[in-house]
């Protein structure tokens, strides 16, 4: 499944990873491309 950035961010928040946004979110966005 291809995630859009907002959807990916929402998914990470739902998974409780929002606290890692400084590290995980940019990496996840890069991996999702």
UniProtKB/Swiss-Prot annotation:
Catalytic activity: Hydrolysis of (1->4)-beta-linkages between N-acetylmuramic acid and N-acetyl-D-glucosamine residues in a peptidoglycan and between N-acetyl-D-glucosamine residues in chitodextrins
GO terms, biological process: defense response to bacterium; killing of cells of another organism
Gene Ontology molecular-function annotations: lysozyme activity
Main EC class the enzyme belongs to: hydrolase
Family statement: Belongs to the glycosyl hydrolase 22 family.
Assembly with partners or alone: Monomer.
Protein's UniProt name: Lysozyme C, spleen isozyme
Species lineage: Eukaryota, Metazoa, Chordata, Craniata, Vertebrata
């Amino acid at each position: 499944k291809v995630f859009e950035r907002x959807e990916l961010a929402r998914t990470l928040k739902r998974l409780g990873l929002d606290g890692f946004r400084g590290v995980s979110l940019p990496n996840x966005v890069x991996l999702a491309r």
